[in-house]
Amino acid sequence: MGLKFPSSGQFLSIDVIDGPDVVPAAKRLLKTHSEDGGVSVWDSSSIFFEMHGLEVSDRPSARTLVLLYAADLCFRLRWEIIPALEGGKCVVAVPYIQTGFAFGAVAGLPQKWLTEVFRFAPNATESYRLNGTSSRKLGPPTSGFIEFCSTTLNEDLRPKFATYFEDLDRRGRCRPL
């Protein structure tokens, strides 16, 4: 990919279950780490916003959704995250790569393929998870990647994502917020 990741700044990530929880959680985390920084949120490139409402008879495959997520993430890295880090700022990326891995695992995609797709994305210095309340009504498809995929696949995927993130926590790969 050719993305040069700076050594300056502080890079944090949060993977969340409910899209509406994204910005408040990211702002709280940012305040605990820095007075100067920003938040990079899902669908900055508008890929998913543009896809929502398209009238097509075929639903995109799980691989297509992962590739689109990776493309959006690459856009965010190139145009939002890396420039802020180069300026010495703290950046909270929400969601980040574990959401892509979680969706791939839930959809039964090979781990090796997922690792190859996301190899361009560096690990965050600190990774967090935020499990929402799955008793809450599923948000609109434009509120988050999990909501978009759940709507596209006609299945509420939040419980499966929560299980995936809890397993990451048990293995020390992220911490709960």
Feature roles, as predicted:
Residues 75-79, 124-132, 165-167:
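Low-complexity, flexible helical/coil segments
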